């Protein structure tokens, strides 16, 4: 998982002194040019959904036409009381894969993220989270662990620069 942003020399952004953690690395040499709290474990926020979407797309391998996912009780009701974003999926509803992807990407839908995690996780959200953490291990991300596919905060849900 690699996120990159290119800025022109004159680009203006938030002052690094007001940022909780950052790391600037020379892409050619791997040399850390500047950092602050780069190994501090912080809430991953939407990086969680990037992993969720990436694993769903990896499993589908671009073949999502005609793929329908069935919404489980847990997809919907595990979010009760979280006041999280959703696309109002209903238990038992069959959702086209493409709609689940778009809903999760565009609306940041946590019910959509749960549905996708079940898809790539062998039928359970827990299996999806296990797949996310297996990918973390494969990528060698020492300071990253996911507790859910949705980005809801938790003590065991963190990443670093």
For the regions a protein language model found, what residue spans apply to each?
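Active-site-adjacent loops and short helices of periplasmic peptidoglycan-processing enzymes
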Residues: 11-159
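Sec-dependent N-terminal signal peptides of Gram-positive bacterial secreted proteins and lipoproteins
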Residues: 1-11
């Amino acid at each position: 998982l690699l996120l990159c942003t290119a800025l022109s020399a004159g680009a203006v952004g938030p002052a690094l002194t007001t940022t909780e953690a950052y790391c600037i690395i020379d892409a050619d040499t791997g040399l850390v040019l500047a950092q602050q709290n780069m190994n501090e474990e912080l809430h991953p926020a939407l990086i969680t959904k990037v992993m969720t979407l990436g694993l769903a797309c990896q499993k589908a391998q671009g073949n999502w036409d005609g793929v329908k996912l069935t919404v489980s009780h847990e997809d919907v009701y595990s979010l009760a009381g979280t006041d999280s974003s959703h696309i109002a999926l209903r238990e038992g509803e069959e959702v086209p894969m493409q709609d689940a992807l778009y809903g999760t990407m565009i609306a940041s839908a946590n019910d959509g993220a749960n549905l996708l995690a079940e898809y790539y996780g062998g039928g359970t959200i827990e299996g999806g989270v296990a797949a996310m953490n297996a990918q973390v291990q494969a990528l060698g991300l020492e300071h990253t662990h996911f507790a859910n596919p949705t980005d809801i905060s938790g003590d065991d849900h963190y990443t670093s620069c």
